[in-house]
UniProtKB/Swiss-Prot annotation:
This is Uncharacterized FAD-linked oxidoreductase YgaK. Residues 29-204 form the FAD-binding PCMH-type domain. It comes from Bacillus subtilis (strain 168). Its EC number is 1.-.-.-. Keywords: FAD, Flavoprotein, Oxidoreductase. Pfam families: BBE, FAD_binding_4. It comes from the Bacteria. Transmembrane segments: none annotated. Belongs to the oxygen-dependent FAD-linked oxidoreductase family. Its cofactor is FAD. The modification Pros-8alpha-FAD histidine is found at residue 66. The keyword Zinc does not apply. GO terms for molecular function: FAD binding; oxidoreductase activity.
Length: 451
């Protein structure tokens, strides 16, 4: 039988654009693959998987380059990159959007906006929609319209066959329903190569947005007020809040309300009464302008970084709030922060076992962030993140799989909760030989949970 050849745009170590081609969002975890294939279509992806299997070459799958632990890269081996497959097709009457695997959020938002539609997705413009969806997908429409994966109706996926080949299958709630379930929060890269997704989009036009800032002295009052307000207010309002180190002297709450400014102002009264706000803004704007407002330029830039996170099921105690404050008083640099987003609403009306995204009962998703410039700073930054995570563990649970943390020992249960065994059964059905694997990929049942 004739051997498969790689097709698509192929970059190797000798190419002048190799360094750009291999670079992911996290510069503290350098990886040097031998070959990067930028797939132009589904056939390129099929050929890449077949070639890797025939030649016994390890590989990784990459989309938006936003894997915090660089799980989409490897040393030596092959990277199968989908980022140049970006076609978006919209059926306005049925409100369906067919989106290829390489499309980024900014492009998706802009295209759907032309039809008066959108998806409940994230805020950073160059995050890949596919990876976001496979991990669940939170953003500033979460409480109004659910997680990104809740809007998924179908996907195309390349899976490994029993020999050395690859098959393209269509996955939905009626076709391979177990794999469809796993694709709604089970994380990327575990079961196959997603080449496209189809979503049920939601109508959107004007939204109202807000920003409120405070100084450090209001830390406890603002934290406590926000956590007891944001997850329980009107479902049409989704908000986030970020706390920076003491010397930065800044706390900022942001949010988006699918409704008029007059209603939003009423809803914000409890938050505005907290402490002494240093600035405030409330306005109504076209949704696409809100997308630009919430896009974080810093989140788009490759940098040396460490991330982790957790979920909160009930408001944190004064002791836990003091712990967060203490860590921010002793942060490794001024770029460190603790960021939270309110959950509940539409996302919380889905049962924990209805999709692979387990943490439906959480009221808050909490992310721990830091980045630095000198390689010598890595250790203290990682220790700060892990110390914060461990210190809060008695009052938090799990971690969002899209905020992976290589330091977490029991990562399968941390990411997937009670859904982990079902995910392993799905893995065993579709990838019993563990062809699709990386440092924290779901293992099939016949393999150790920690491998």
């Amino acid at each position: 039988m004739e051997k498969t050849k790689l097709t698509g745009r192929i970059v190797t170590r000798d190419d002048p654009d190799y360094n750009e081609a291999r670079t992911n969002i996290n510069l503290s975890l350098e990886r040097y693959p031998d070959i990067i294939v930028f797939c132009q279509n589904k056939q390129d992806a099929l050929n890449a998987l077949k070639w890797a299997r025939e030649n016994r070459v390890p590989f990784r799958i990459r989309g938006g380059r936003h894997s915090y632990e660089n799980f989409s890269l490897l040393n030596n081996g092959l990277v199968i990159d989908l980022s140049e497959m970006k076609k978006i097709t919209v059926n306005q009457d049925k409100k369906l959007a067919y989106i290829e695997a390489g499309a980024e959020l900014g492009e998706v938002y802009r295209t759907l906006w032309q039809y008066g539609l959108t998806l409940p997705a994230g805020t950073i413009a160059n995050v890949g929609l596919t990876g976001l969806t496979l991990g669940g997908g939170i953003g500033l429409l979460t409480r109004a319209a659910g997680l990104t994966c809740d809007s998924l109706v179908q996907l195309e996926m390349i899976v490994a066959d029993e020999k050395e080949g690859a098959d393209l299958i269509t996955v939905s709630c009626s076709n391979h329903p177990d794999l469809f379930w796993a694709s709604q929060g089970g994380g990327g890269g575990n079961f196959g190569i997603v080449t496209s997704m189809t979503f049920k989009a939601v109508p959107i036009s004007q939204v109202s947005i807000f920003s409120i800032t405070w100084g450090w002295d209001d830390f406890e009052e603002v934290y406590n007020t926000w956590q007891n307000w944001a997850p329980y207010t009107d479902d049409r309002l989704t908000s986030s809040i970020e706390f920076w180190p003491k010397e930065v002297n800044r706390i900022e709450a942001l949010g988006q309300f699918v409704g008029p400014k007059t209603e939003l102002k009423k809803l914000l009264k409890p938050l505005l009464k907290a402490g002494s706000p240093t600035s405030g803004m409330v306005k109504t704007t076209p949704f696409i302008e809100a997308v630009t407002f919430f896009n974080s330029p810093g989140g788009n830039q490759p940098q040396k970084m460490k991330r982790s996170g957790s979920f909160i099921e009930k408001p944190l105690s004064e002791r836990a709030i003091s712990t967060i404050k203490h860590f921010l008083e002793h942060a490794p640099n001024q770029n460190a922060s603790v960021w939270q987003q309110a959950l509940g609403g539409a996302a919380g009306r889905v049962a924990p076992d209805q999709t692979a995204f387990y943490y439906r009962d959480a009221i808050i998703a909490q992310e721990y962030l830091t980045n630095w410039t000198s390689p010598g700073e890595k250790r203290q930054n990682v220790r700060w993140i892990e110390g914060l995570r461990t210190s809060l563990s008695k009052e938090t649970m799990g971690d969002y799989v899209n905020w992976p943390d290589i330091e977490i020992r029991n990562w399968p249960r941390t990411y997937y909760g009670e859904n982990v065994e079902r995910l392993r059964r799905v893995k065993t059905t579709y990838d019993p030989e563990n062809v699709f694997r990386f440092e924290q990929s779901i293992p099939p049942l016949r393999r150790s949970l920690f491998f």
